[in-house]
Amino acid sequence: METKKKDKRVLINVLNIFFSILAIVVFMLYTRVEFLHMKELGLEYEKIYNINLKEKIYIMSITFVITFIYILCVNLFLKKDFKKLFKQENKEMPKINLFTPALLIGVLNSIVANFVFRGKILNLLHTAKFGKTVGILGLDYSFSLLISPIIQLLLFYITVFVILTIGYAFIYYILVVNFKLDGIDNNDFIKGNFVKLFRRLGIFLAYLTLIIYVLRTFDIYSGDMLKKQQPDNTYLTGAGLGDVTIKLWGRVILIFYFLITIIRLNKDIKKQEGIKVVKKVISIPVLLLSLQVILLLFNNVIIRQNRLEKENKFIEKNIKATEEAFNIKLDTKVISEAQELVKKDIIEAQEVIETVPIISKNIAKQNLESFKKKDSPYKYMNTSVINTEEGTKYFTSREINDTKKRTIEDKTYVFNHGIFGALTDSAHVDEDGFILFDEKMNNDKFTLGNKVIKQPRIYYGLNTNKTTVVGKDILEYDYEITSKETKEKEIFTNKYDGKSGLKLGKFDAFLLSLTKLDFNIFNEGQNKDNKVLFNREIIKRVKTVIPDITYDDKPYIVPNEKGGLTWVIDGYTWTSYYPYSQRIQIRDENGNLRRINYLKNSIKVLVDAYDGTVQFYILDETDPFAKQIQNKYPNIFKTEKDMPNIIKENLLYPRKLYDVQARIVENYHKIGADTLYRSEDIWEISSVKNENNKIIDTRYLNIKLENEEKPKLSLLTMYTPFSKQNINGYLIGSIVNGKNKLTLYKFDQNESLLSLNLMRDKIHEDEKAKIELDKISRMGTEVVRDTMLVPISTSILYVEPVYQIHLNENSVPVLKMVIVANGSKVGIGSSLKDAVSNLFSDTAININIYDPNDMNFLLEKIINGNKNLKESLNSKNWKYIGKDVDKLTKLIDELEKAKAKDDMRKNRENIDKIQSNRENENHELKVKKEKENTINSIFDRIFKPEDSNARK
């Protein structure tokens, strides 16, 4: 029997040692793979690996030691209880292995802790200051945004671990008591060490919860502050009067109460005073609920009468913080009145009109797919826009299609890179309406953005997921040319001579082939003349270096100074807890919905498409989130000044940032606290849906800004007042001197420039326009319409290209017509030039742009203005009384003007109706007279006596 027990102990010890060694080996192998990934990126990134490795060792070793000692103490604590129980039953206590559970749990916990806290401890040690303070303690924003979340995560992790420990101890205790003993008496159980352990850990958890509650107090400043008035009804973010008085100081009082309660609770439990314990536990949720009730009464009763005045400074904080957090630095231009375009405006804007993208990116890509050969080894990826000497072009990168069914050998050695791409003219088509594009596949000169491309190959891209082996003896598929005469294919090959890739030894080759599940790496990767290229998908590649940054999922290609291709990836920093900044809902890089209130494009990453070289640039050194990463990894980042000029010249305003900023500007466009709270000047983005019921994306247009010699590629968004259809402003996002710039144009008055949706509907309701559109709507075809608004002078030109696509296998989009409109005039032509010419000719179609909702819109604003004035009068707020009277007077003046114009329109319609009736009457009289003359003529021929001379 003793021998069996001894053998069992030996087996347990052997297994213990085995699993410990296995854990160490797995850790070392995993670490080696990480090292290979960093080594492949370059020498400077090995420093990042070393920094991360130190952090990992610290996290895992400290976690292991603490966990091991902690579990060992728990086991020893329980063992004392077991000794007592076995002694009471006169049984020999079996030997309990204290070290094995402690060792295994220690190893497991250290691995989990590494994954949870990886990178976060470094963040904690390299915090950057915001230079702004918040709260009664006057702490820098960095505490609540950078430090507190990590501390809370640590406390939450400890809390979960302690709860699991209690579960572990309980199961351990129950198993021993039920399987080794004959149960346990209740009194013995209550007086036993397990209950003591449970009590101590419970009190410890209470203290942890209290600390988390203290830290969560800072979240008050990024909570829901107060609800805006109709029609918006959204909550402003921040801390209002009730929050900084009742809620904040109420929490401070509760914190001290909870601290005293926990101390006294511990004493009451020791004394086994159950009633007191229950009372103290129940008092906590009761007090929390009471605080919420008091806050509700304060907000809805005490300050309801004069809420705007009392909340004014907090709303102003919200406005300021929102503009800071989303980098909304608006250069605002006011256009006194929108004017209809004249020929002079068109002539002066010729440079802009010639580059209007009548071809969308989707149409351009669809066209390329139509012409692509079925057996093509390539796949078209991202389409981006770039200015060239010939005009604005779309560049669609052409990468290897690694999803095609090929042998593993072909994927590893032969089909491993893409080559250049296709350039599509965005503003012109040929005389038959076919899209103009240039798809180079040979050794001709490749040109992109006025730069000759000497190295057009793409080894690192968006679809380069496979690991590949390259070398001087390995011939890779490059491109093929089919002879026009013989129809035979000539295949050209390439040998990679870039600096990227690793020469691997047997061990590293085996390890990498194991992780990539590709044993060709092991077979050929260890050849001294070969190199292994891996981690080639560019988003994953940059995440390998710095995963803290959120990367744009739509990078674009630009030419570099060496005559190669470079990917530009926009990097973003964000948070949901920036004090007072307004929250907005977006989709993150994984497609999940998030509510954020801070977003900056502070980082750009350049990745060489040929050799995979990665370079990080920090563009906004005032962003503490970016500065924290820079502090963590010194010498990795370069500044905007270090960026090559050719890259700067081709940078685009980040669409993801712009789309968020455009939504923020709907409410935050240089307005006051009263306007924001009362929702008096809410805008809506003027968007339109395509045939698939999807909103058409914002697009890059060439727009000429003030004080700029040439038009710049810019993003454009049009706005209408909430629930109204007239354009009242537009936002331009452009790159000026290498920096993002937002320019907002506001119309003081505009009745002739309609939103995209309304203008589209008005045009398509017109009979003449319908006839033209019906001509191309045939059976077996699909009509695709695209729409955009182009700012010209003090007006806006509506442009709608119309494509016809035959519903067959090779469906090529063909431009059939272009519709343009401005004010009440519509021009239709086979091209943009013809359509603009017809807009100012006799063939122009006149449409009715009157919107019957205009009067109702003004009446609603007057009613709301009167309501606001009454509130100001009741609260005797003279500041807002004056403002409200001025606003109401202005609205009444606008109503009078609108009424006068409406009366003129009605009079004109009546006059036109009278003239039309008269014309109809005259026409009827004329027809009647002609009929009478015809009848008389026939009668005369039949019955009038014949002339005597005629008879003769």
Regions found by a protein language model. Give the residues of each.
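Soluble extracytoplasmic regions of secretory-pathway and membrane proteins
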Residues: 3-875, 879-923, 938-942
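Long, low-complexity, intrinsically disordered segments
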Residues: 919-952
